[in-house]
Amino acid sequence: MARSVWKGPFVDLHLLKKAEAAQDAGSRAGPIKTWSRRSTIIPQFVGLTFNVYNGQKFIPVSVSEEMVGHKLGEFAPTRNFPGHAADKKGKR
């Protein structure tokens, strides 16, 4: 079920403040470190880089216009799929 339109997109307040500060700092601001995977990417985030925590390490996410409306966590995968085990019978 989608979020109701009248509520607007969810963004953690501390993340919004950090993004505004980074916009004011300009190009000299580094990536914004965040644990808030649940925050929606809004147009003010375009051009910024976030380090999003995936449960083990921080994954750099550079925000582009196509990402607006998605969640930050969508771009920092939490699971690693190493592939299926090789077929032992076929190796003979």
Swiss-Prot record:
GO biological process assignments: ribosomal small subunit assembly; translation
GO molecular function: rRNA binding; structural constituent of ribosome
Pfam family, one: Ribosomal_S19
Signal peptide: none
Family the entry assigns: Belongs to the universal ribosomal protein uS19 family.
NCBIfam families xrefs: rpsS_bact
Descriptive protein name: Small ribosomal subunit protein uS19
Lineage summary: Bacteria, Pseudomonadati, Pseudomonadota, Alphaproteobacteria, Sphingomonadales
Gene name, Swiss-Prot/TrEMBL: rpsS
